C-alpha cells in the first residue's frame, strides 16, 4: 500500500477538489450485502434517508461550508464501479463463500449511480435528505456521513501550519499504537475495523487499518470498508443493519405484520446468506421484545450483535436467552460494536472469556480519536454522534427504538406507537458520544 505523509497532505491546499469519497466501494461491506437483498426482494420500495446530528451543540451548518459540501456530494454522484472493483467483487470469496454476489446483481451494480440529494439549512444544522428507490438511496448513508465528518475535520485543521500538523499526527499515531499494544494482551481477540462512517479522514482510516494489520496480525480479522479490504488484501466484514427491520415495520399494514417484521427480514436474509453472516441485530425495537417473541429458529443462527445496550449487560441477556432456548453459548458468537474503545474491549473480553465466542467491531474511537493530540484543544477534532437513517418507506414513517432511548429515531407520535406495541422494558438512557 502507498504510504502517505498525512500531515503534508492535509496542509497542501492546492487541489481544486480533494475527494473525500474515492470509490462507490468506499463504504461498509454490509451495505452491499443489504443492497443485494433489497435489489432482489424489495425492488419497488421507496425509502427516504436523512442526516441526523445527535450532537446538537455542534451546529454543522455554521462549521462546514455549503459550497464545499455540495462539491463533495456532487463528486460522489459521479462515481461508478471500476473494472478492477467489479472483477474483485465477482471473483473474491467473502465469509468463505465464492460468488456471494449474483451476476445479475453485479451487472445492475456496474451502472449504479448515487441518486440526487436535497440540502438546506435549519437552525444551524444541515437538512440533508435522499429520496427515491430504496435500492438507490440506501447507498448514500456511508458516503454522506464520511463527507460530513471529514469536512468538519478539514475545517478544524485549516488554521494549523505544517509543523503543528506534523506534531498532531505524530501524537495521534503514538496514541493509536499504545491502544494496539494493549490489545496484544488478549490472546484470542478477534477485532475488525468498523470506523468508516465517522472517520477523521480516509487517509487516517487507512493508517489505522495498517496499524492493526501490523500490530495485532493474528487478532485483526478485517475491515468493514470494502475499498480498504480490496486494496490491503483484507477480509471485508459486516452483517446487516437496523434499516432492514425499520423498513419492514414501516411497510406493515397490520399489528400482526408489525410484530413479525423483525423476523421477516431475518428469513429474507437467510434466503441469500448463511454461516457467519447469520448474525442477529436485535435492538431495532428493543432487545427484550425481540427475544421475548423470537421464533425457535432464531436460536440456531450463528450469533448476535448487541448494539445499543452496555456490552456486558447486553451480552448477558443474550447468553441467558440462548440457555433458555437450550443452546450452548460457547458455540455461539457475540459481536460487540457500540462506541467501543480499548478499556471497554478489554473489560468485555475478560468478562466473557471462555463463555462465548467474541468479535469486536472498533469504530469511531479507532478512526477518529484525536483527543489531547493537538498542542491546544481543537473542539472540531472531537467526534460527534451523527447518523444517516431511513425515515420513511413508501410514504410511511420509519422508527428505531433502540435499547438506549437517546438513539431512538422517528416521528414522536410513531415512536410512542411503537413503544406501546413492542414495550419499553430494559431500555436505559446513557449518553451517546459517538
Swiss-Prot record:
<keyword id="KW-0436">Ligase</keyword>
<feature type="modified residue" description="Phosphohistidine; by autocatalysis">
    <location>
        <position position="242"/>
    </location>
</feature>
<dbReference type="InterPro" id="IPR006406">
    <property type="entry name" value="Nic_PRibTrfase"/>
</dbReference>
<comment type="pathway">
    <text>Cofactor biosynthesis; NAD(+) biosynthesis; nicotinate D-ribonucleotide from nicotinate: step 1/1.</text>
</comment>
<comment type="function">
    <text>Catalyzes the synthesis of beta-nicotinate D-ribonucleotide from nicotinate and 5-phospho-D-ribose 1-phosphate at the expense of ATP.</text>
</comment>
<protein>
    <recommendedName>
        <fullName>Nicotinate phosphoribosyltransferase</fullName>
        <ecNumber>6.3.4.21</ecNumber>
    </recommendedName>
</protein>
<dbReference type="Pfam" id="PF17767">
    <property type="entry name" value="NAPRTase_N"/>
</dbReference>
<dbReference type="Pfam" id="PF04095">
    <property type="entry name" value="NAPRTase"/>
</dbReference>
<dbReference type="InterPro" id="IPR040727">
    <property type="entry name" value="NAPRTase_N"/>
</dbReference>
<dbReference type="InterPro" id="IPR007229">
    <property type="entry name" value="Nic_PRibTrfase-Fam"/>
</dbReference>
<dbReference type="InterPro" id="IPR041525">
    <property type="entry name" value="N/Namide_PRibTrfase"/>
</dbReference>
<dbReference type="GO" id="GO:0004516">
    <property type="term" value="F:nicotinate phosphoribosyltransferase activity"/>
</dbReference>
<dbReference type="InterPro" id="IPR036068">
    <property type="entry name" value="Nicotinate_pribotase-like_C"/>
</dbReference>
<dbReference type="GO" id="GO:0034355">
    <property type="term" value="P:NAD biosynthetic process via the salvage pathway"/>
</dbReference>
<keyword id="KW-0597">Phosphoprotein</keyword>
<comment type="similarity">
    <text>Belongs to the NAPRTase family.</text>
</comment>
<dbReference type="GO" id="GO:0005829">
    <property type="term" value="C:cytosol"/>
</dbReference>
<keyword id="KW-0662">Pyridine nucleotide biosynthesis</keyword>
